[in-house]
């Protein structure tokens, strides 16, 4: 039996035409990496037009057509004009329509003017030989990483042992309970790590809206057309060529999206090769919620929740923690609904993906908060409180202690890997778009998103952390660990639910029941 929250969501969506076009994106479970077609997607698609590449020409792999076009343009010193607005689409079918935009794209993706011979003889300039060798080596390294980590993840280790005998939780984080009586709490100030592209679906909602099911959407929003452009332009990773940025990257949380689009290629390359910034990563970052706003909303909800209860009906510490996790899950669902790719799925597929990975997204959200902002020896709650880890450990039972210990180990690993916000966002999408979810109507889209995000993450890591040669693989290997912790947390939560310790009207439990159905 599906929980009420799902039936309401599906019923309303069907009443507006089945298609689940609403803001949204999320994560996924056991991460089985397939042998993605990196040869085709990364090595054999011309970055200018998408045609099959024929070899290295003027600085990078391109097709014969773009090679010849670039050579003729440079040798004949041609000057083109664009009759549109200098943003024509260049692909295999219409690459000849606008030579101006085609040539600009050649420069943007990295074809080098200085590689064209002025004497019109055959063959390029020998000084690019070492660069080609390095490029080949990088591509071979990419393939090796993909295959190695694919094998490692296919042979996933057994999930951590769940639910030991001692399931007591003595007084679980007493200081949170006392602090909640007098909220405001000591807020943790979030610095420039947070961007300001507010999700339209979650921005400015009063706390009362958090009581509503996140799946119940107004007829107005359901009737709205899909996001402009939909999935067009995202089908192949080749469409997301790395942008050229002068010097350091602008931080996406303090810069407009436009500021990330880069500078004219030739000018930027004057001082050497700039790093690359996969455009897909920028698009994923735009979906991120504003964390201070989420924090304020959850705090307001908890205040309202406690204030509405009588003196002897106040939630105990564990009840408060459940409410906190419950509201965090609401915000995660809102994030998913407002995210690229996810909103293109029908409602049934959205529900299957969310039911599969909701606990992993909660764990990943918690872990990343610790990596970025928690003080040593403390746990940072979504409400902004720093809680002493030793105090929690001393008051928790064996199972909760085991969970916390595994989570802290994961935090330490990710800190040592220097996990950043861009990588975190990629991991969220890899979890949400799980290849393990069965009976999806649009499995092709899920598979495509996995491939694109994997490729974008790999490019980002290799360009920005070249000294950490195994970072990409190490990041992917954390996904099974997140999965294992989340399954253990689900078992623990279910046990507490059976004992009547979890507050009623809880989205956590509804999702738990839906997953077990």
From Swiss-Prot:
CDD domains, alphabetized: NR_DBD_Lrh-1_like, NR_LBD_Lrh-1
GO molecular function, one term: RNA polymerase II cis-regulatory region sequence-specific DNA binding
UniProt free text on domains: The C-terminal extension (CTE) loop competes with a DNA minor groove anchor of the nucleosome and releases entry-exit site DNA, thereby promoting opening of closed chromatin.
GO BP: cartilage development; digestive tract development; exocrine pancreas development; hepatoblast differentiation; hormone-mediated signaling pathway; liver development; positive regulation of tendon cell differentiation; regulation of DNA-templated transcription
Short sequence motif named FTZ-F1 box, residue ranges: 128-147
Gene name for this UniProt entry: nr5a2
Phenotypic consequence of gene deletion: Larvae lethality from 9 to 14 days post fertilization (dpf). Fishes show an open mouth and an enlarged Meckel's cartilage of the lower jaw, but no other craniofacial skeletal defects at 6 and 10 dpf. Impaired development of the exocrine pancreas and liver, while leaving the endocrine pancreas intact. In the developing liver, defects in hepatic progenitor outgrowth and differentiation are observed.
Spans annotated as C-terminal extension (CTE): 112-127
Domain NR LBD, chain residue ranges per copy: 276-515
Basic residues bias spans: 186-199
Subunit structure: Monomer; Binds DNA as a monomer.
Protein name: Nuclear receptor subfamily 5 group A member 2
Amino acids binding Zn(2+) 2: 82, 88, 98, 101
Residues that bind Zn(2+) 1: 46, 49, 63, 66
SUPFAM superfamilies assigned: Glucocorticoid receptor-like (DNA-binding domain), Nuclear receptor ligand-binding domain
DNA-binding region boundaries: 43-118
Region ranges (Disordered): 182-211
Keywords from the UniProt entry: Chromosome, DNA-binding, Metal-binding, Nucleus, Receptor, Transcription, Transcription regulation, Zinc, Zinc-finger
């Amino acid at each position: 039996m599906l929980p009420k929250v799902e039936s309401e969501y599906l019923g309303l969506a069907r009443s507006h035409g089945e298609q689940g076009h609403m803001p949204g994106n999320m994560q996924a479970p056991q991460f089985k990496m397939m042998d993605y077609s990196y040869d085709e997607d990364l090595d054999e698609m011309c970055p200018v037009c998408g045609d099959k590449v024929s070899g290295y020409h003027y600085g990078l792999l391109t097709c014969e057509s773009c090679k010849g076009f670039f050579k003729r343009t440079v040798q004949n010193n041609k000057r083109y004009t664009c009759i549109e607005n200098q943003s024509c689409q260049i692909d295999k079918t219409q690459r000849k329509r606008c030579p101006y935009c085609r040539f600009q794209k050649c420069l943007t993706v990295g074809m080098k003017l200085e590689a064209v011979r002025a004497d019109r003889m055959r063959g390029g300039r020998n000084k690019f030989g070492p660069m080609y060798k390095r490029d080949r080596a990088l591509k071979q390294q990419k393939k090796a990483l993909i295959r190695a980590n694919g094998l490692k993840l296919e042979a996933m280790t057994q999930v951590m042992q769940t639910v030991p005998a001692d399931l007591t939780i003595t007084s679980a984080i007493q200081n949170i309970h006392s602090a909640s009586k007098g909220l405001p709490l000591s807020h943790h100030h979030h610095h420039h790590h947070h961007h300001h592209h507010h999700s339209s679906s979650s921005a400015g909602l009063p706390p009362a809206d958090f009581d509503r099911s996140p799946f119940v959407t107004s007829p107005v929003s359901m009737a709205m057309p899909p996001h402009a452009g939909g999935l067009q332009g995202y089908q192949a990773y080749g469409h997301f060529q790395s942008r050229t940025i002068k010097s350091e990257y602008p931080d996406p949380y303090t810069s407009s999206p436009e500021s990330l689009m880069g500078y004219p290629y030739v000018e930027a390359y004057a001082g050497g090769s700039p790093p690359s910034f996969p455009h897909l990563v920028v698009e994923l970052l735009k979906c991120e919620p504003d964390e201070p706003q989420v924090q304020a909303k959850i705090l307001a909800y908890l205040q309202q929740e406690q204030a509405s209860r009588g003196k002897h009906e106040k939630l105990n510490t564990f009840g408060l923690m459940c409410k906190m996790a419950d509201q965090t899950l609401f915000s995660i669902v809102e994030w998913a609904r407002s995210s690229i790719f996810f909103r293109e799925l029908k409602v049934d597929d959205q529900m299957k993906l969310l039911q599969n990975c909701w606990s992993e997204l909660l764990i990943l959200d918690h872990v990343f908060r610790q990596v970025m902002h928690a003080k040593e020896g403390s746990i940072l709650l979504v409400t902004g409180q720093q809680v002493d880890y030793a105090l929690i450990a001393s008051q928790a039972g064996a199972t909760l202690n085991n969970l916390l210990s595994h989570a802290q180990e994961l935090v330490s690993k990710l800190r040592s890997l220097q996990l950043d916000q861009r990588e975190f966002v990629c991991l969220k999408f890899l979890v949400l778009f799980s290849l393990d979810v069965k009976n999806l109507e649009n499995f092709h889209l899920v598979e495509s998103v996995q491939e694109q995000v994997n490729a974008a993450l790999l490019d980002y890591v290799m360009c920005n952390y070249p000294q950490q040669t195994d970072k990409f693989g190490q990041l992917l290997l954390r996904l099974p660990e997140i999965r294992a912790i989340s399954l253990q947390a689900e078992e623990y939560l279910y046990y507490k639910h059976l004992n009547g310790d979890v507050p009623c009207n809880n989205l956590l439990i509804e999702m738990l029941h839906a997953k077990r159905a």
